[in-house]
A protein has these predicted regions:
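Enriched for short, Lys/Arg-rich terminal
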Residues: 1-4, 12-25, 60-67, 71-93
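Residue-level signal for threonine
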Residues: 8
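PIN-domain endoribonuclease scaffold, especially VapC-family toxins
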Residues: 25-37
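A short, surface-exposed loop/turn module that caps and links secondary-structure elements
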Residues: 34-61
């Protein structure tokens, strides 16, 4: 069973910004599909838990300088897409 996807308003703004920068959405959509269906991500995406202000969230690399911050909630099978962007474009990373 796949997870329901919730997109934060900031994530939606981030996606628009990435499109304006000329990024293609296919790599992001591929990763989101894997996460939604609980398919393990390839090691080159460097999926890892975050600490500090981002504790409880996870980050993976869509491309070398394109990140996705997300959270999985197992009790309700929810995938929350929190932020996407570059290292310098996401405060606090």
């Amino acid at each position: 069973m796949s997870r329901e996807i919730k997109r934060t308003s900031q994530f939606k703004k981030d996606v628009k910004r990435m499109l304006r920068q000329g990024r293609q959405l296919e790599p992001l959509l591929d990763v989101v599909e894997k996460l939604q269906n609980d398919i393990p991500l390839p090691s080159e995406l460097r999926d890892h838990p975050l600490v500090g202000n981002w504790h409880g969230k996870r980050e993976c690399h869509i491309e070398p300088d394109w990140l996705l911050i997300y959270e999985k909630t197992d009790s309700v099978l929810l995938l929350t897409l929190i932020r996407t962007g570059t290292h310098s474009g996401i405060p606090g990373l």
